[in-house]
Amino acid sequence: MDQAELSIEQVLKRDIPWETYMNTKLVSAKGLQLLRRYDKKPESARAQLLDEDGPAYVHLFVSILRDIFKEETVEYVLALIYEMLSANPTRARLFHDESLANEDTYEPFLRLLWKGNWFIQEKSCKILAWIISARPKAGNAVIGNGIDDVLKGLVEWLCAQLKQPSHPTRGVPIAISCLSSLLKEPVVRSSFVQADGVKLLVPLISPASTQQSIQLLYETCLCIWLLSYYEPAIEYLATSRTMQRLTEVVKHSTKEKVVRVVILTFRNLLPKGTFGAQMVDLGLPHIIHSLKTQAWSDEDLLDALNQLEEGLKDKIKKLSSFDKYKQEVLLGHLDWNPMHKETNFWRENVTCFEENDFQILRVLLTILDTSSDPRSLAVACFDISQFIQYHAAGRVIVADLKAKERVMKLINHENAEVTKNAILCIQRLLLGAKYASFLQA
């Protein structure tokens, strides 16, 4: 049978030769006694044994996973642990019992993530997540006990699953499910962002219809919400298509828990950086108004919708035209919005282009190098030509930034709109501002 399709029930039907393991000193006499009392017994009997002697069973199971490498036995012990924890997740505290203080209870599971078949990987991942979440807390702090390396190792495996899943249909969902519970941990957030994990979430944010895909979408959005509390992750969210995708989800989703987690994410991000401008540009005020007319039962969602609506109204009042323009450029998707051709916009805002060492001008030039969207290329060429016309040192600045070579490449572009604006840009660059009105004609 394909190991990926193995069930817990099938694995637990096996008869494991524990006596043989004792004879070869891989299981102690006491361990064998514990196993005989526990193995193949009814759930009520096993529950009583765990209540009476839980840490001893944890020690036994972890020891077997550390010392025995036979696949069938490893699967069997993982199934026993998984069954024990899924029946009562609070039993994960047993792994942190004082009697096990000198034992690395994480190591076998972390190792098996990379060594085993899919059944072994999946069960090891879920068990690790339970054990990590059950860590004892000292005051407001969680007791460490070498946990940082464990978390980093687990994050590495989770990111690997998102990039190249070990199982075609279950690899990604198990990774997202795990992350949605672990991203509460500061070390996990940090490791995940450092591993460039945030970009792996973005493609998963899209409207869903089936029960499985809705759950995956919900847990992905939950990950984004947890990351919205972490500044380095926020920087990535601001420059990716995350906001557009979340907006599409909230427009088309009828699942209350999905809508709630997206709205709570928006509420978190609204006061930060350029998110407010993005939300306005994406038409979120209208979407929020529409959502408020629906019959939601969740009070938190209703409160969040009201707060977001008020926050967006306030943001619209404060948003300058250059803020909106800057946001559009930073997202890399340009369109012929009115401001691009408004004389007043360029006269009033051309000096704003000097901010951050001409950041916006540099981004426009980067769009020329990297974008495959004809509309974005055409608008970028036009805007650079506008900067040349309206800034006193426009020609010199643009020439210093090596714009000529980049624009010249677009003169023979297959799209007529791109060609026209590339030629205009080159003419202004070569001939100067006093010919601008003549050239525009």
From Swiss-Prot:
Topology in the lipid bilayer: Peripheral membrane protein
Gene3D superfamilies: Leucine-rich Repeat Variant, V-type ATPase, subunit H, C-terminal domain
Location of the protein in the cell: Vacuole membrane
Domain of life (superkingdom): Eukaryota
Keyword DNA-binding applies: no
Keyword tags: Acetylation, Hydrogen ion transport, Ion transport, Membrane, Transport, Vacuole
SUPFAM superfamilies with a match to the protein in the record: ARM repeat
GO molecular-function term, one example from the UniProt record: proton-transporting ATPase activity, rotational mechanism
One family name in Pfam for this protein: V-ATPase_H_C
GO CC terms of this entry: chloroplast; cytosol; Golgi apparatus; plant-type vacuole; plasma membrane; vacuolar membrane; vacuolar proton-transporting V-type ATPase, V1 domain; vacuole
Purpose of the protein: Subunit of the peripheral V1 complex of vacuolar ATPase. Subunit H activates the ATPase activity of the enzyme and couples ATPase activity to proton flow. Vacuolar ATPase is responsible for acidifying a variety of intracellular compartments in eukaryotic cells, thus providing most of the energy required for transport processes in the vacuolar system.
Family: Belongs to the V-ATPase H subunit family.
Subunit structure: V-ATPase is a heteromultimeric enzyme composed of a peripheral catalytic V1 complex (components A to H) attached to an integral membrane V0 proton pore complex (components: a, c, c'', d and e).
Protein name: V-type proton ATPase subunit H
Source organism phylogeny: Eukaryota, Viridiplantae, Streptophyta, Embryophyta, Tracheophyta
